[in-house]
Amino acid sequence: MRFTNKTVLITGAAGGIGRQTGLSFAKEGANVVVTDLDFDMAKRVADEIQSAGGSSEPFKLDVTNQDETIETMNNAYKHFGSLDVAFCNAGIREIVSPLELSIEEWRKVIDINVTGVFITAQTFAKHCINNKTKGNIVITSSTLSITSAPNRCAYTASKHATAGMTKQLAMDLAKYDIRVNAVRPGVIRTPLTERYFQDEEASQKVRNLHAMKRWGEPNEISSAVLYLASEEASFCTGTNLIVDGGWTEGKDW
C-alpha cells in the first residue's frame, strides 16, 4: 500500500471529496487526520474510516484560524508520530450576482478559500522543515481557476488565487523537499453541488458542461489526489492536474 505508516491531514473532510479522499487514503494504509469546522461530521467520517479497519482521528478546525491550525497539526503529530501529507480541501462558494454580493460574503469566501489554504500549507511546511521531513501538499482547485462562470465572482477569484499560490509554493518549497500540487475538478456530485441535480433540466445542463456528457464522482478526484501525494508523482510539483471530464473543452452555457 502506498501510504503505510504515513499520516495525512485533510481539511474540509466531513463530506463529498474530503470524505472520499479520507477513505481512499485509509484504504492505502494511511493514518487520516479528519478536520472540519463541523466536528460531529468529522467524527462521523473518522468513525467510518475506523469501522472499515483504518486509522483516523477527528479534529474541529477553522482553517482561517492560524493558532488553531498550528495546534491541530501539533496534536496530530503527537497522536500519530508523523505528518506527511496535507490535503487543503476546505472551501465554500457563492452563487449571486456580483452586483448583489455583499462585502461580508466576499471576504468569507476569500478568507476560507485563499487564506485558509495558505495557513494550512504554511503551517504544514514549517512542520516538515522543523522535523526535517519531506512533505506533500495537495490543493483542491477548480475549473474556475482558469475561466469563469455566471454569478461566482468571489469563488472564481479565490480559485484563480490558489492556482497561482500552488505554483509559487511549489517554487519556494522545493528546496525543502516539499512538493505542492493541485487537482482541478469539473462538476463533482457532492452535498455542495446537489442543487444542480434536483431536476432533469438542471442535470442535463451539468452533463453538457463536460465533453464526456456526465458529471464526476468523488472517488475520481480522490484517485488524483492520492496520485499527486504518492511517490508515483515524485517528480511532479507546481502542477494543476485536470480531472474535469473535458469541461474546459466541452462546456455549453
Regions found by a protein language model. Name each.
Residues 3-33:
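Canonical Rossmann dinucleotide-binding motif of NAD(H)/NADP(H)-dependent dehydrogenases/reductases
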Residues 87, 174, 179, 236-238:
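Short, small/polar-rich loop/turn modules that mediate ligand/substrate recognition or access, typified
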Residues 121, 158, 166:
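Active-site helix of classical SDR
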Residues 126, 171-175, 234:
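Alpha-helical segment proximal to the catalytic Tyr-Lys
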Residues 142:
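Residue(s) in the substrate-gating loop at a strand-loop-helix junction
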Residues 147, 226, 237-253:
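Short C-terminal tail/terminal secondary-structure segment
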